[in-house]
Amino acid sequence: QLPETIEKSEFKTIADLGKERLRRVIKEIKVLIQAQKEKEAATIFGDSDKYKLDLGFKVFKLSKSNFKIWDSTLEKEPEVIQAKLFEHIQHISPEAEQEAILYELLLKSGFELTTPIEKLTLAGLTVFSIAEGQLLICLEKELTHDCIKAMAEMQPTRVICLDEGFKGENADALKTNAVQIMKSKGVVNFRTV
């Protein structure tokens, strides 16, 4: 929702009005659930698990990318190109939060914001499973062979890892092995950002 202003209202924008309406509905649902739980608690066969609902919502705002964008209009001078290359070694904004990077990659991969995301722990590292394992995203800054192997064994269609996750003196070997491990398990698209 664009931040369209509202005249003659206690809310500044339509988005603010929508958020308040959602909050009120959630509050009403919680009251109804509590009343039903109390009613069922009086019976022997009360089942409170059926009332476990996700009653939250997220608000997304359009903002600049978390990734630096390459300027293709650069002069052809080798010194200028070299300077720009060094600037892009660290191409993720230092202020970027993990959740913001995750959702940006989700959108850039063609998924909707409502796509189910599951947080997994593979070989001690956090990996996000998108759309029931179609896409795995690992935003860890120190990848391990075991984590790469565990992701590949899940046989997703696509895997995205941070380029900076491949660190140390064996970084190139780990990245090369990651590509081969993914291919051997049928992962169609493995890339780093």
Predicted regions and their residues:
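Accessory, often C-terminal, charged low-complexity segments
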Residues: Q1-V193
